[in-house]
């Protein structure tokens, strides 16, 4: 059934920040709880695949990329569901799929000692299901938030939903390492099954927003409309992808402790930038903000690549998180303003699909590169992609100036 209730009246321009935040807050809290389950296995999966299942760096990249590939393939459906049936339904379905993914993690853990290949297959199936769930949660939450507060606040919606996601990553990663040490991968699996139930308790009491009226633009046309900002998102997301997939192995390769803190520092930089500068893409324009942010991320990736001690790697994670933080809403503002309201969910799905493309392709490619050059080389790749995103931001800025 469709979501049936519209948001309250928009506040006056002079008092927009607090009412907008309060309307987004319940969604952000639910997304935080849901993505805590995604963050738990982040530092654990590379160790589990490389160690308990005795696979190599390439398979680590494939397992990491499986979730993102599945998310990519489900984006069109997620956007269509949010537009046709309501964003609330999409979010609820996403959390249920996340819990189902945990059941496959449990199966993988049960098979690991005697049938490692079957365990790997179950793990990959769980990652694929999690990818579909993540797609529905993110697309639905973004569409729901923009429906509540209006497209003029799209940057704030993306900013605060993003804060929830990366705060969950930042806290979930060290918690996952502790849980893995205490209860093994089975503990991670049970947590993945149960945590979405908490998120559902937060989401179900919330009122939805009506699907916007009007003619819906076909998804392939929406994809074309958001192509350029989506390319910027794809390039700037590679740095995030190589941190999530390979940082534990980089620290092991260099004989360092504290890999889980890289996720915390990345998340900390991400959150601080969002807290203090969330409104900049709406105020200054997405292209201008993106131009600065991707340069900061490139510096962070360079520090991780060249670091001789963990301190410099920690600094690189902080800068990478801060730079990536506003790049997502900055490019996203440019995407939203290109599509009609009736296709907003499809636009969110199409835009975030570029993140999936980046992570689904970059993780296996980075795994191949790591096998040739070592794990440090993947951060040179992340920095080069961030510099490529600068070129996209310059192109977007030129188009905005030409249209003015």
Region spans (language model):
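Helix-loop boundary and gating motifs at the non-cytosolic
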Residues: 22-63, 68, 232, 238-250, ...
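Hydrophobic core of transmembrane alpha-helices in multi-pass small-molecule transporters
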Residues: 32, 116-136, 312-326
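Residue-level signature of mid-helix packing/kink "hotspots" within the transmembrane helices
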Residues: 68-76, 169-170, 270-275, 359-360
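Helix-to-loop junctions at the C-terminal end of transmembrane segments
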Residues: 74-86, 273-285, 370
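C-terminal ends and interior cores of transmembrane alpha-helices
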Residues: 96-116, 296-308
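Cytoplasmic helix-loop-helix junction between adjacent transmembrane helices
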Residues: 126-164
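C-terminal membrane-cytosol helix-exit motif in multi-pass small-molecule transporters
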Residues: 193-212, 392-397
